Amino acid sequence: MFLFENVRGLLTHDHGKTYATMLDIFAKAGYTIDKQVLNAWEHGVPQKRERLITIGIRNDLVGKTEYTFPKAHSYKPVLRDVLLDCPEGPGVPYGEKKKKIFELVPPGGYWRDIDPKIAKEYMKSCWDMEGGRTGILRRMSLDEPSLTVLTSPSQKQTERCHPLEARPFTVRENARCQTFPDDWEFCGNVSAQYKQVGNAVPVNLAYDIAKEIVHSLDILEANTKIKEAI
């Protein structure tokens, strides 16, 4: 078996041709494929993060085992569950001007929730864009999950301001949003640590997927023993 994880956009990249090419390669390599888009928020992760999960089972094992995608949890965590007692960690502050503007944005709000004159001056050329503006001056809410944790804490079109303070999330806060344990160590400078966290698969989502892989292998082992006994 194999597991392949990627962003949901892979399904539509180049009008679907990229993923179709990959599926063709997997088929020629002798694998039967199953796929599903999973949202980490439904698997114990306080973050909206959709990922395409592709499972491959070798053709000669089809019929001897199967893979079932994990079911959604009954409780979906929010930022209140992970931020209020989060240990301190390295981070990157906003400049003084951006900090003062973010102080005007309410939790759960974004650029439309402040004085249009201030928003327009901040957004500059982005003000006239037809789309791609919902991430500008975006502030998280304790009562909602985080948006997708990214590799950089303060890009203008993908901002994620802390709900209680006018600053980006720290590395450790992002790690909590990815459900890393607090004793997990990240390496390198602050920028490198942000990238490690942002590129990771959320721990709780990975665990749910892996449990089902173990179950599939247990089924295969049991069927193999039965065949040998016969």
Language-model region placement:
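S-adenosyl-L-methionine-dependent DNA methyltransferase catalytic core
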Residues: 25-28, 51-196, 200-230
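Conserved Class I SAM-dependent methyltransferase catalytic core
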Residues: 1-48, 53-57
